[in-house]
Structure formats: C-alpha cells, structure tokens
UniProtKB/Swiss-Prot annotation:
The gene is Kncn. It comes from Mus musculus. May play a role in stabilizing dense microtubular networks or in vesicular trafficking. The keyword Phosphoprotein does not apply. Keywords: Membrane, Transmembrane, Transmembrane helix. Residues 110-124 have a biased composition (Basic and acidic residues). The lineage of its organism: Eukaryota, Metazoa, Chordata, Craniata, Vertebrata. This is Kinocilin. GO terms for cellular component: apical part of cell; apical plasma membrane; ciliary basal body; cuticular plate; cytoplasm; kinocilium; microtubule cytoskeleton; neuronal cell body.
Length: 124
C-alpha cells in the first residue's frame, strides 16, 4: 500500500504540519485558563518549531555548508578559570573542597536568616 509521493508534495505536507502546529499551539495558549493547558500549547509550539527546523535543515545545510561548521562546534570545550592559588603549591583537590565548604556555609547562613526566629529575623 505504498503511495508514491513527490518531494514537492512531501515538503508542502511538512510545511502544512508545521503551520498547523504553530496555529494550534497559539490558539491553545491564547484561550487557556490553566497552566496545564498552556503547557500543552507550549508542547505544540515546540513540536512545530522542531518540525520547522527539520524542514529548513536541508536548505540551511546547503546555504551555510554545515558539514564544516558542525564538527568545529562539537570540538568546543569549556574550561573554568583556574584560580590564582593553583600556582602556590596548593592542590586543586583541596581548593575544591574548601570552595564547597565555603559555598555550603553561605547557604547555611542564608537558610538561618530565612527561618522564623532565626538570626536574621530578630525584631528590635
């Protein structure tokens, strides 16, 4: 039961599905009262956006020569700045532990301030 379809007809059907998803998502979000209904509309919009990306990918690939760009993007690495104290003979393991303790004490102080009757909520 295979029905032959031309590439042009397939692209038109694909674009029609994207347009239907955008319209349906916009209408659902526009008339929704609850957050759950708005979330469903957002799912429709996200699916339509993905469909649009799939639709446009061959054109973008031909226009911007993505075969050279995508591997370069994949090779990017993010290296956090190492602190100046690494050169003073301290191991990075100790500095990471001290940084975690410092962050934990900051969080603990903040939580103490937020507690009812805590140190930061004293009334004078």
């Amino acid at each position: 039961m295979d029905i032959p379809i031309s590439t042009r007809d397939f692209r038109c059907l694909q674009l029609a599905c994207v347009a239907l998803g955008l319209v349906a998502g916009s209408i659902i979000i526009g008339v929704s009262v609850s957050k759950a209904a708005a979330a469903v509309g957002g799912i429709f919009l996200g699916a339509a956006g993905l469909g649009l990306l799939i639709f446009a990918y061959p054109f973008l690939k031909a226009r911007f020569n993505l075969d050279h760009i995508l591997p370069a993007i994949g090779n990017l690495r993010i290296h956090p700045n190492s602190g100046p104290d690494h050169g003073e003979g301290r191991s990075s393991n100790n500095s990471n532990k001290e940084g975690a303790r410092s962050g934990l004490s900051t969080v603990t102080r903040t939580l103490e301030k937020l507690k009812p009757g805590g140190r930061g909520t004293e009334e004078g």
